[in-house]
Amino acid sequence: MIIDWNYNRIGEKRPDVKNFILEKKYKTIDIGASAMYWSYPECKYVADSVVISNEGTTFFKLNLEDKSTWSELLSYVETNGKFDFSICSHTLEDVFNPLDLIGLLTKISNSGFIAIPSKYDEFLFLYGQPYRGNAHHKQFFDMVNDKLTIFPKFSWIENDERSNEILKYDKGRELSFYWENEIPVEIFGVGKPFMSDGDLMNEYYKQLVK
């Protein structure tokens, strides 16, 4: 289940997470940490594509978008048991199938912390660019009824005035949460028929403008 989710400043929760795993003495793995290994030295296990060689760190080289490369990590967990805790920070938004990565997190750890850019961040015009959010992000996320919901980055968000309405409620550029045992997740619109583009767009903004 999802515990203690918040909108916050980017990186605001990192000291709390480091203190948490230190106090609990949790065996922790950071998934996707190569770009920014902020969980070190409290976290001594990393899985990603770019090798990290920090002292005392055990590294699993894999491609988060290719399940055939996960065998070393999964074999380790099968032999040694699940990690107490996992960290996945600013990674889910980068992969084409976040459901696979979420499944990996629950397969290798009993609990964890996830941080992702918030919807407010993804609807901003960042760094002087003429488009909203980050071009390399495949989707964005929000909490709907305490469930992590994946939203497609439809092209029409660039010009629809309701995109600006979302920003009036800005509560922070990062969405973060702790979880235990499982991560409730769904994809916006799956299993729900829409009669028209207008219906789709109206439901999209109904869930996001707040």
Model-assigned labels for residue ranges:
Residues 99-210:
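S-adenosyl-L-methionine-dependent methyltransferase catalytic module, highlighting the catalytic core
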Residues 24-124:
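Conserved SAM-binding loop
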Residues 10-11, 52-54, 66-69, 146-149, ...:
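A short acidic, often aromatic-flanked loop/helix-cap motif at beta-alpha or helix-coil junctions
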Residues 1-23:
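Class I SAM-dependent methyltransferase Rossmann-like catalytic core
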